[in-house]
């Protein structure tokens, strides 16, 4: 599908035409402390696709400047997710590899009188910063000598002080209308081992300082980030200029991708996992890429969805079901269409020979003959969906089976229901039907029309299977729930597990195999599925519930 809009693409075209840059270089800079989600996919896909469109390249840089909660587990997961989406970064960098360079640039700022060591606590720094309508106050430490600042900063590096005891701040303007320019902290003390550097460092650069320097070191031309960094751009440019970086990158902000009935906050996702509301980060109800993969979404569907939503400077909300449409569009001609019965009701064909099973020809995808055919079993005992039978036909619109009525079994014969068997509670547990041998599918029979077509599986050859059906994990905030936590908005019916059957052709199914189960929806074989216990996850229904 066609891309809607992308204002950064227009900027890149102009920069190349006017000679401001010779080659487009972008980067994706995740912090390795969480799993990537669909929101990150917007940044990844646009970083790579835009650079590729102009013959440039993209780097992956791990922004590992905060040692708390960072680790190799997330590094590996992020690399795997990017490759799964279909991209290979030209280089894989780590922000921590630039610690020495960044330290030296901070020393340069001190020598230029543009940075100082401060003794104020974090709370005091906040209080001194002022408000949007009131200027900040200068720290008592702001006018320390260059010599003293150099000495104290070295002592900070040497581990002489405890966590939070001192910071290094840029010396800009405490009266600046942009609060970010009011002497921001650029180094803090953290006696926490780093996942790559170990205990070599106990001072770590802040994001606003590290990020522009990393971009400059790597030769990034267009540094794309989300819209909340819009008022940080002036600081980004200040650090690049005052640190005398030989390459000058530029920052561009775009609106976040927000989806209905979806939370993407790292804190919220971690809470869902840690408190057991989901089975893990790859629970198919989660918005993480590993979860979407497990649920059955493909890289192609996600790429098409992201590119279609485009980039703008406005935060917007997209209906989460839009993603389903791209999966349907991609899979409708390439997914095979076996039969699965999720909520089985037993059918006995009274006039079919006991102990006999015949095999009928069935198309793998009636819209794509190139996918060929398969054999399906038909016999005396069958399963159909409970929802496909009602004792008394309610109206002429009912196009399924009812008592004394006739339907076609897909790829097989007409059957007529003659009687039902009920349990002690009055529930129907078995149908007794007859079939008409003259009505075999493909025979050209036109003697009468059935009351619709339904699917089935043959009992003796059918394979038991578990079907996981998913709905939104969390509901959007409403007027009634606006004062409630997101936990209170969780959907108690977000996961429904059904026990049913699939046809025998699925005996060799493997994790991530995708199917369109006829009349049921698009499904994917779960990673925990085995030959003895088949498990299928519903990726999306056959049709969208909105349009």
Where are these regions (language model features)?
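Conserved short loop/turn motifs at secondary-structure junctions
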Residues: 29-33, 61-69, 91-100, 123, ...
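Substrate/cofactor-recognition hotspot
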Residues: 305-547
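N-terminal catalytic cores of NTP/NDP-binding nucleotidyl/phosphoryl-transfer enzymes
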Residues: 4-13, 17-79, 193-226
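Active-site cores that bind ATP or allylic diphosphates and position pyrophosphate for catalysis
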Residues: 64-66, 72, 94, 108-269, ...
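A glycine-rich helix N-cap at a beta->alpha junction
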Residues: 74-100, 105-106, 113-116
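Secondary-structure transition/capping motifs at alpha-helix termini
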Residues: 17-20, 49-57, 81-91, 216, ...
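Long, charged, mostly alpha-helical binding arms that flank functional sites
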Residues: 247-326
